[in-house]
UniProtKB/Swiss-Prot annotation:
Organism: Coccidioides immitis (strain RS) (Valley fever fungus)
Subunit description: Component of the eukaryotic translation initiation factor 3 (eIF-3) complex.
Function of the protein: Component of the eukaryotic translation initiation factor 3 (eIF-3) complex, which is involved in protein synthesis of a specialized repertoire of mRNAs and, together with other initiation factors, stimulates binding of mRNA and methionyl-tRNAi to the 40S ribosome. The eIF-3 complex specifically targets and initiates translation of a subset of mRNAs involved in cell proliferation.
Lineage: Eukaryota, Fungi, Dikarya, Ascomycota, Pezizomycotina
Protein name per Swiss-Prot or TrEMBL: Eukaryotic translation initiation factor 3 subunit L
Keywords of this entry: Cytoplasm, Initiation factor, Protein biosynthesis
Length: 481
């Protein structure tokens, strides 16, 4: 099968719902992954570690294409990182600014993802390294070299490349045409009709999601995916690493925007998918990286469930109990003892945030670690909701209760309790996605407990949905037979 045929978009299909939890759809997703694993067209065994070997056998631009997907050495020197940046600039300049579209066949069907992934990884690691050198002042020679090259691996340059690839390929217009059941080739143009540009443009959208999330702009991160449908037919779902990355950053963005129900749904999808395909991933190079990310998502979903208690898939719940056990129970219980645990889990599972601007090498004390900054923002949210589980446990026992009486039970001042109740009520109103773009949704009450305060009297009402036993039986019957 040619690259053209493998990367061509489906002609027309109706919009699919992102929240597709039926076992039929899940099994179809797993079967689709099996086909990808066993598909053999002469390039299925080509992976990132063999790209260097391919580069040595080719000439010119073809060698650059393969080399661009090759990971940089873990302890690469600063000069090597500068040279890698220059190589990427040269490659993207040629692809974007040639007199006409570059007519090249890509080395493999997932090459475009490898290039964008490695490009952003090197940008992220360089930014963190530069910030660390500026804060510690441990190597004056390297600090001087970094000071003299502020634009190397600059945020503007990286974003410019990603946006240019998207614009040149007309990929957003193509995706919009697919949604409208129209022919994407009618709007693709000379560049977008070629696999090289179409694939680079498509995965640049996923790259933008990642970069904006690393920069802390979570709303813009989700906005970039407006034209991509989050379902099993999307192109990113054909590449396991891209599939995992997309759902990780979408879920994390939802979590930081306090849309915990959407974050749990997003994380649950990819965790279930990985659990059903892990037997086909073992032995592949990306397996260890995915297993590590899987543990990170388990930590994030534990945090989200502590803020928004909900039923989880049996597989996920078992994974949480096995991985965290008592820690998971402590999170759900809340209170001051849970604070260090929240910070530990967040730091271990969050992206490695970066700063959009170069650090101040002359004033090291002014440089803040972006991870520390976002952790502090997150911990402020934790402190605001730390006593919600305890407060709710008392409220569930009554239909009306005096504010001062409850304050006495909790051993806090009445006005302090009033502020807790207000925060808890505000946090229980969340935007929940149903259809449309990822930022869209309707405001719903995410808690099974509601209350209103009249003077010093608390009026409490509890609405708990019954368990849908029919769905439970159908799911388990399908698994058994």
């Amino acid at each position: 099968m040619s690259v053209d045929a493998r990367t061509a978009y489906p002609g027309s299909r109706p919009p699919a719902n992102m929240q597709d939890e039926s076992d039929v759809e899940e099994e179809a997703l797993v079967n689709n992954y099996k086909e990808q694993v066993h598909f053999d067209d002469g390039m299925s065994e080509l992976d990132r570690t063999t790209s260097l070997g391919a580069a040595s056998q080719t000439q010119g631009l073809q060698a650059q294409l393969a080399a661009a997907a090759t990971p940089l050495e873990f302890q690469a020197t600063l000069e090597t990182k500068f040279a890698s940046y220059d190589n990427y600039c040269s490659l993207f300049h040629y692809i974007l600014n040639s007199d006409g579209p570059v007519d090249l066949e890509v080395p493999s069907y997932y090459w475009a993802w490898d290039v964008i992934d490695e490009f952003i990884y090197q940008f992220e690691s360089f930014c963190r390294y530069r910030n660390r050198v500026a804060r510690t002042g441990s190597n004056e020679e390297e600090a001087q070299l970094l000071r003299e090259n502020p634009n190397t691996w600059g945020c503007y340059s990286v974003l410019n490349v990603l946006y240019s690839l998207i614009q040149r390929s007309q990929i957003n217009e193509q995706l919009a045409a697919i949604k409208a059941n129209e022919d994407p080739m009618a709007v693709a143009g000379d560049y977008g009709s070629r696999p090289l540009y179409r694939m680079l443009g498509y995965f640049s959208i996923i790259g933008l999601l990642r970069v904006h999330c690393l920069l802390g702009d979570f709303s813009l991160a989700l906005k970039t995916l407006d034209d991509i449908e989050m379902n099993k037919k999307a192109m990113f779902a054909r590449v396991m690493a891209a599939h995992f990355t997309t759902y990780y950053y979408v879920g994390f963005s939802y979590m930081m925007m306090r849309r915990y129900a959407d974050a749990i749904r997003t994380f649950s999808h990819i965790l279930v998918y990985v659990s059903r395909t892990k037997n086909f991933q073992k032995g592949r190079e990306s397996y260890d990286a995915i297993a590590k990310k899987n543990d990170q998502i388990l930590a994030l979903i534990a945090i989200c469930v502590s803020f928004h208690p909900t039923r989880l898939d049996d597989t996920i719940h078992s994974g949480l109990r096995e991985k965290y056990g008592d820690q998971f129970i402590r999170l759900q219980r809340g209170g001051p003892d849970a604070l260090p645990l929240y910070e530990e889990l967040f730091r271990s599972a969050c992206p490695k945030f970066i700063s959009p601007t170069p650090p101040d090498f002359d004033n090291p004390a002014l440089n803040i670690d972006p991870v520390d900054h976002h952790t502090a923002v997150f911990m402020d949210e934790v402190r605001n909701t730390l006593y919600n589980p305890t407060v709710k446990s008392y409220l569930k026992l009554y239909t009306t209760m005096d504010l001062k009486k409850l304050a006495g039970f909790l051993e806090v001042e009445p006005e302090q309790l009033r502020s807790w109740l207000l925060v808890n009520k505000l946090r229980s109103r969340q935007v929940r996605w149903s259809e449309g773009g990822l930022l869209e949704g309707e405001i719903v009450n995410s808690s099974d407990l509601d209350y209103a305060i009249e003077g010093n009297l608390i009026h409490i009402s509890e609405t708990k949905a019954g368990r849908r036993l029919v769905d439970w039986y159908l799911r388990n019957l399908a698994r058994t037979y």
